[in-house]
């Protein structure tokens, strides 16, 4: 198991500077993380800097509220792919889910999957805002829409991933869809809890700290 390939090394703060983007790119190269996850404005630059590495470029769509129109999310996705994004992390229409407008939620995801043209799509359901049944339903809709991952959180809604939610999501989607845990995964202990619960991708700004913990761990 290559632990570094679980990590999307993430910097999504609105005030992120080019210097900070350079830092996470350098760290991702040094540790050979799966990807760097950056806001769309940084995608082209990140893709150019990572062209000679295995590290992928991940970006976010309809982020962080999920309240953009479906057409806007589709355009954002097309633009990101054109600029060099390899993976797309989109936010669902959370209000539509709570309304019970499940067709709208699924069609929103499907539009992004179509616009991504075969690139990996991860669907952020914002678990902290959902109850048990809503987490199950959002996970089911993600699977039905043909996305690759269901993801816990944006990190912007006041809460992050829990092992309980990750397990519920994994139990719901089964083997066909993977689970990404993000938000509040800060160290080796958090990382292990998420992986044991079924996550195969971890979104974290603390990728280096996690890896240093792994390197210091006698079981690694």
UniProtKB/Swiss-Prot annotation:
Protein keywords: Cytoplasm, Lyase, Schiff base
SMART domains: DeoC (SM01133)
Enzyme class: lyase
Localization in the cell: Cytoplasm
GO molecular function annotation: deoxyribose-phosphate aldolase activity
Active site: 89 (proton donor/acceptor), 151 (schiff-base intermediate with acetaldehyde), 180 (proton donor/acceptor)
Pfam families per UniProt: DeoC
Matching InterPro entries: Aldolase_TIM, DeoC, DeoC/FbaB/LacD_aldolase, DeoC_typeI
Taxonomic superkingdom: Bacteria
Gene Ontology biological process terms in this record: 2-deoxyribose 1-phosphate catabolic process; carbohydrate catabolic process; deoxyribonucleotide catabolic process
Broad class of where this protein is predominantly found: cytoplasm
Pathway: Carbohydrate degradation; 2-deoxy-D-ribose 1-phosphate degradation; D-glyceraldehyde 3-phosphate and acetaldehyde from 2-deoxy-alpha-D-ribose 1-phosphate: step 2/2
Enzyme Commission number(s) from the entry: 4.1.2.4
Reactions performed catalytically: 2-deoxy-D-ribose 5-phosphate = D-glyceraldehyde 3-phosphate + acetaldehyde
Key word Lyase present: yes
Cellular component, GO annotation: cytoplasm
Role according to the record: Catalyzes a reversible aldol reaction between acetaldehyde and D-glyceraldehyde 3-phosphate to generate 2-deoxy-D-ribose 5-phosphate.
HAMAP family, per the entry: DeoC_type1
Family under the similarity heading: Belongs to the DeoC/FbaB aldolase family. DeoC type 1 subfamily.
NCBIfam families registered for this protein in UniProt: deoC (TIGR00126)
Name of the protein: Deoxyribose-phosphate aldolase 1
């Amino acid at each position: 198991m290559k632990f570094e390939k679980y990590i999307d090394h993430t910097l999504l703060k609105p005030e992120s500077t080019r210097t900070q983007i350079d830092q996470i790119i350098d760290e991702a190269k040094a540790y050979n993380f799966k990807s760097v996850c950056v806001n769309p404005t940084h995608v082209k630059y990140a893709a150019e800097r990572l062209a000679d590495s295995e590290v992928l470029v991940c970006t976010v769509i309809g982020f962080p509220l999920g309240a953009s129109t479906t057409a806007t999310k589709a355009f954002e996705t097309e633009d990101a792919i054109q600029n060099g994004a390899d993976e797309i992390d989109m936010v669902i229409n959370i209000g539509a889910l709570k309304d019970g407008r499940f067709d709208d939620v699924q069609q929103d995801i499907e539009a992004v999957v179509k616009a991504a043209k075969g690139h990996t799509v991860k669907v952020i359901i914002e678990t902290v805002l959902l109850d048990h049944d809503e987490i199950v339903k959002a996970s089911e809709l993600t699977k039905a829409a043909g996305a690759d991952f269901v993801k816990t959180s944006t990190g912007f809604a006041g809460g992050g991933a829990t092992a309980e939610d990750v397990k519920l999501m994994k139990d719901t989607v089964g083997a066909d869809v993977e689970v990404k845990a993000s938000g509040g995964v800060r160290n080796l202990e958090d990382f292990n809890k998420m992986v044991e619960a079924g996550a195969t991708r971890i979104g974290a700004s603390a990728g280096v700290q996690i890896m240093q913990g792994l390197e210091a761990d006698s079981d690694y």
